[in-house]
């Protein structure tokens, strides 16, 4: 991943239910190969931390909306992880390691499904390792890879590049030419921009 990459990029953080919804359809919606780039959403300028629910009713309404979208798209029933939001740093370092070994997409999809269809807290390393094992990543290699300074630096660099490209929150699709499309519902607009 370089500053002058020629193809589009899909930015995600595994703690985001919106990114989960988008991830489940990026491959089918975008008309060209798109690089999946894990970022630490909290390092983006306008990231929604999802900690601002005024009450449990607000939280339930949010997840009800996500559940309706998931059901309409034929996804597995939504099971919000407890606690939510969870600390995704370890999971995002594993996603960065997965990117370095060519397993970004299968790992991200498995991890999103663990979190939002399985109701598993991805701040628990064992839950992340289950997702990694589902895409043939050995637990020892994953644990060692996530602990590398170079992996932490790569995640930081990806987050900084995303911010320079105008990514404010996840999910987001950056297209060559500099346009950024934020949110699950913007995938169709990104697809149109990619064929224009």
Residue ranges and their predicted role:
Residues 4-32, 113-196:
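C-terminal cap of thioredoxin/glutaredoxin-like
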Residues 14, 18-115:
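Structural alpha/beta surface segment adjacent to cysteine/selenocysteine redox centers
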